[in-house]
Structures are given as structure tokens and as C-alpha cells.
Curated annotation (Swiss-Prot):
GO molecular function, one term: hydrolase activity
EC numbers on record: 3.1.2.-
Enzyme class: hydrolase
A cellular component annotation (GO) from this entry: nucleus
Active site: 124 (charge relay system), 220 (charge relay system), 248 (charge relay system)
Native species: Emericella nidulans (strain FGSC A4 / ATCC 38163 / CBS 112.46 / NRRL 194 / M139)
Name under which the protein is recorded: Esterase dbaE
Keywords for this protein: Hydrolase
Length: 278
């Protein structure tokens, strides 16, 4: 399931625009995330086309979701949220995530969109998955070089309230001893782990070096974990940071959203998506 910009003239002019693939948090869905991102999308819709992917697994919504969106189910997740959730193999999780992403992209192509896929934008569990997708892309580029050019090449990711560790999403090597870089976890692991894996002291293999923008609410109970994702899993010269006075949610006030918008435009310019401010 993908959630689209409304049909009509408003939809038509976005068909050629660079596309941002949006990944919702655990226990919500694409429709809810579209509503949560409504202000951000309004500021950026003249330059970028937002496409919302739906996670593959049924999930229980949190109280913060049901208080506002209780009538907007079914609720979905990308990963197991807790150890109480049904067990699934890492291979199954990776396969279903890849299928959800591919379906969202294919559906948008079938609606006539032609813009390059240039970025990922995720919130909470969706941010973890977005960072992990970017890490998988980085790994593929390192291994295949120019042969990886036929795959979608995301230039950067916007990570809102994302926590580590990164998840190993390469299906051909997602199981077996020694197949996962130290510091990462396989896709069968619950995403709300109380503890994170030990990080290597003599290697930076676990580090994401492609550009990321981190958006942190300063009143978010998980702020320390979000900062750990930035500091421990993302190379320092590739990160940008926006902090705002908010809880665990997507910014809605104009002053907070414009700070995020400014950094997205800056990343788009720096990565060659835009030659100048649009």
C-alpha cells in the first residue's frame, strides 16, 4: 500500500520531481505518516515528490498513536518491536521489507512518476530502517562499484527520532556466523532492544558514511538513543543535525519545520540533486 499526493492538477506537476521515499514508524502506517508529515510535505512539494511506503507486518499501536489515529488502522511495523512480537527469520523480514519498498516504488512509477529516487525519510523505527537501507546501499557500492549503478541510489536520508543499532538488510548474507558486521544486528532482532551490540574499537565497518540529517526532539524520552545513532553509527563529517523543542513526533510548527527544510535543501545541493535553491 502506498499513500499518494491527491489526484488532479496538484498531482500532475509532481510527476517529474525528485522523489523521497518515506518510511513510517512502528505501530502506525503510511496513511498516518502522510498526515504526520503534512506540514513538511507542504513546504517541499514544489521541489520533491513524497511517496509513502507501507510496512509489511501487523503491529500493535502505541498509546500516542491511538490517542489521535485510533480509527486509521490497520497498524504496521517494519521490524519486531519487542521480544513479545512473533518470531520471524531474518531472511523473511529482509524479503518482506524489500518487497514493501519495491512495491511503493513500482506503484509510483505506474502512476506516471519519473523523478529520480534521491532520498529516504523515516521516523522512529522507519528511521532505523532508512539508515539501514542506506548502509546496505553503501555496502553494495563498495562491493560492486559501477555494477551497482542499476540499483536505486539514494543520495541521503532524513532520520527523525531514529535509534540504533543498524540492521543488516542484505538477504544473501543476513544469516550465518561472521556474516554481519560487528555492531549491527540481524533483521529478526526486536527494534526496541534494551541494550545495543558491542561496537568494534579497531574498525569503522559499522559506520554509515553516506549523508544523513538527524532530527531530534529535545523532550523526546529516547533522545539519548537518537544521539547515539548519530555519534556511534554515522561518520561525523557526513551528518547534519536539527534539534527542536518537541517530543517523540514529527515537527509541525513552521519554525521547526523550516529548520528541517533548510537542511534538506542543503543536502540536496551538496549531493548534486539541486544546483541551487529551488
Amino acid at each position: 500500500m502506498t499513500i499518494r499526493i491527491p489526484s488532479g492538477e496538484e498531482a500532475d506537476y509532481t510527476l517529474h520531481l525528485p522523489r523521497i521515499l518515506c518510511l513510517h514508524g512502528g505501530g502506525t502506517n503510511a496513511r498516518i505518516f502522510r498526515m504526520q508529515c503534512r506540514v513538511l510535505e507542504r513546504f517541499l512539494r514544489s521541489t520533491f515528490r513524497f511517496v509513502y511506503a507501507e510496512a509489511p507486518f501487523a503491529a500493535q499501536p502505541g498509546s500516542d498513536v491511538t490517542s489521535v489515529y485510533k480509527d486509521h488502522g490497520p497498524f504496521k511495523a517494519w521490524l519486531r518491536c519487542t521480544a513479545a512480537d512473533p518470531d520471524r527469520s531474518a531472511q523473511e523480514v529482509v524479503k518482506k521489507i524489500n518487497l514493501s519498498i519495491a512495491t511503493a516504488m513500482y506503484d509510483d512509477d505506474m502512476r506516471g512518476a519519473t523523478g529520480e529516487w534521491i532520498a529516504l525519510l523515516g521516523f522512529s523505527q522507519g528511521a532505523k530502517v532508512a539508515a539501514s537501507i542506506l548502509y546496505a546501499q553503501q555496502t553494495i557500492q563498495q562491493r560492486l562499484g559501477e555494477r551497482a549503478a542499476t540499483r536505486p541510489r539514494f543520495r541521503f536520508a532524513v532520520l527523525m527520532a531514529g535509534r540504533g543499532p543498524l540492521v543488516w538488510l542484505l538477504p544473501e548474507t543476513s544469516s550465518g556466523p561472521g556474516s554481519i558486521p560487528m555492531g549491527l544486528v540481524d533483521a529478526a532482532s526486536p527494534s526496541m532492544l534494551d541494550s545495543e551490540p558491542e561496537l568494534p574499537t579497531d574498525s569503522t565497518e559499522h559506520m554509515l558514511r553516506l549523508p544523513t540529517l538527524h532530527v531530534h526532539g529535545l523532550r523526546d524520552p529516547g533522545l539519548s538513543l537518537h544521539r547515539r545513532l548519530l555519534r556511534s553509527y554515522c561518520q561525523s563529517d557526513s551528518v547534519s543535525l536539527v534539534e527542536w523543542e518537541g517530543e517523540h513526533r514529527v515537527p509541525l510548527k513552521t519554525k521547526d519545520v523550516t529548520a528541517v527544510v533548510d537542511q534538506i535543501y542543503a543536502l540536496a545541493r551538496d549531493t548534486g540533486v539541486l544546483d541551487s535553491w529551488c
